[in-house]
């Protein structure tokens, strides 16, 4: 009897987890948007989001990365007991690792030697996690009608990573042709030289939007499934 009560109460608690995931994701987005107004000196077309740490509002960037990581953690917790396949479980673990990378990025800013480690933990793991989890969720009741959005949003993660790589190579090549050295420990030029095609900043922001959309979509769809048919999300 006690086990039955626990099982019946657990889904409601997980909906609160979904709500928290959504709240922290939205707070992260709000922090990022506000940085564009608080620190307009960082041109969004070619300055990476992490460079806001060199401005006067590093604490807002800290909120951005922290809330992003917490949202990923909450989503991982939400899905851990919900997914059933080994691939899905592996995806949830990778999502938790990705959230850890995002949290570390809050503490290890762009000037810290471990900032690259944070990015390695946070970015590629999210791509694999979203694909593994999404391909499992599309087989579950309540997800079929939205599987197109689910899968497209998952595939958009790796597309956004490829976009960053391409635009980064284009920008670095342009800087080299202009005689400007760009690399670790080198400060970026104050003004973009003529002839340099620099869109990596936009690509960076597209990646963030794509990652956030997936988190929001998964958490919100979980909520909708529970409201429509609570039994579908019970263990």
Language-model segments: what does each one mean?
Residues 75-77, 127-146, 157-171, 218-219:
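Alpha-helical transmembrane segments in multipass membrane proteins, preferentially the mid-helix core
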Residues 51-70:
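Interfacial helix-start motif at the membrane-water boundary
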Residues 20-31, 151-173:
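Hydrophobic alpha-helical membrane-insertion segments
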Residues 49-51, 177-201:
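Short, membrane-exposed interhelical loops at transmembrane-helix boundaries
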Residues 1-14:
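Short, Lys/Arg-rich, polar N-terminal cytosolic tail immediately upstream
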Residues 10-13, 78-90, 138-152, 224-230:
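Membrane-interface helix-boundary motifs at transmembrane edges
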Residues 25-43:
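Alpha-helical transmembrane segments of multi-pass membrane proteins
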Residues 100-149:
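Membrane-proximal helix-loop-helix units in multi-pass membrane proteins
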């Amino acid at each position: 009897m006690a086990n039955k009560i626990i099982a019946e109460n657990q889904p409601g608690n997980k909906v609160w987890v979904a709500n928290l995931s959504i709240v922290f994701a939205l707070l992260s987005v709000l922090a990022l948007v506000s940085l564009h107004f608080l620190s307009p000196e960082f041109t969004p077309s070619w300055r990476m989001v992490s460079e806001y740490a060199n401005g006067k509002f590093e604490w807002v960037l800290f909120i951005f990365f922290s809330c992003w990581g917490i949202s990923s953690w909450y989503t991982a917790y939400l899905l851990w007991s919900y997914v059933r396949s080994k691939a899905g479980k592996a995806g949830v673990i990778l999502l938790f690792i990705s959230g850890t990378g995002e949290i570390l990025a809050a503490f290890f800013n762009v000037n810290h030697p471990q900032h690259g480690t944070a990015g390695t933990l946070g970015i590629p793991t999210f791509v694999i996690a979203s694909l593994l989890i999404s391909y499992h969720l599309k087989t579950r009741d309540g997800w079929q009608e939205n599987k197109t959005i689910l899968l497209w949003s998952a595939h958009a993660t790796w597309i956004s990573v490829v976009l960053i790589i391409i635009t980064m190579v284009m920008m670095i090549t342009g800087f080299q042709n202009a005689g400007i050295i760009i690399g670790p420990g080198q400060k970026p030029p104050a003004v973009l030289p003529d002839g340099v095609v620099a869109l990596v900043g936009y690509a960076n922001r597209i990646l963030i939007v794509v990652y956030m959309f997936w988190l929001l979509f998964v958490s919100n769809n979980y909520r909708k499934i529970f409201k429509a048919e609570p039994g579908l999300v019970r263990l």
